[in-house]
């Protein structure tokens, strides 16, 4: 199955508190999927602060069905993760990606772009992000099982590959495109 970047805007949540005062929540959550687990960051833009950070460690050798169960269990147990969020962004941080020049990109060739970087890519969902200012496409394999658990829990959300976000931030700090070297340690 092939998909492009999935985007969702979850509408602002308005609730009536117990004392009948109108309460508006403006909270954002980002979730980073790494090879060793998931990290959750809840940000309150109204207060301009990070409210909480959580991490769920998962062994790389754990079977996918058990990973799904552990993630679902964790999401149900952590109260702060059980609330409504205005936006949710998921970053897939894995080595299963390839950058492709925009001029050479065609959705019917997604498998071809990954065949040199990814050992096992058949029967996988392949997605892609666009770095329009750089005229590049990042083709990658998201973790479909965890995306499914997150979709069942939160509804629709936006996801992209970690390197798309990282490259976007780095390039934002170098608008004149001067020679620069960046390193990232994971």
Regions found by a protein language model. Name each.
Residues 26, 47-53, 67, 85:
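A broad structural signal for short, well-ordered beta-strand segments within beta-sheet-rich domains
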């Amino acid at each position: 199955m092939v998909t492009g970047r999935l985007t969702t805007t979850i509408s602002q949540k308005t609730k009536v508190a117990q004392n009948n005062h109108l309460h508006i929540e403006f909270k954002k959550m980002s979730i980073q999927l790494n090879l060793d687990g998931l990290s959750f960051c809840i940000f309150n833009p109204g207060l301009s602060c990070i409210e909480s950070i959580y991490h769920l460690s998962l062994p790389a050798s754990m079977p996918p069905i058990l990973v799904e169960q552990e993630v679902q269990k964790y999401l149900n147990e952590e109260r702060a993760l059980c609330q409504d969020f205005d936006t949710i962004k998921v970053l897939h941080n894995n080595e299963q990606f390839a950058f492709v020049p925009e001029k050479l990109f065609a959705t019917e060739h997604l498998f071809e772009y990954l065949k040199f970087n990814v050992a096992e890519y058949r029967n996988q969902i392949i997605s892609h992000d666009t770095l329009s200012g750089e005229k590049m496409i990042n083709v990658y394999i998201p973790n479909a099982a965890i995306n499914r658990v997150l979709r069942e829990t939160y509804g629709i959300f936006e996801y992209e590959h970690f390197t798309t976000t990282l490259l976007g931030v780095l390039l934002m700090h170098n608008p004149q495109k001067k020679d620069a070297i960046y390193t990232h340690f994971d």
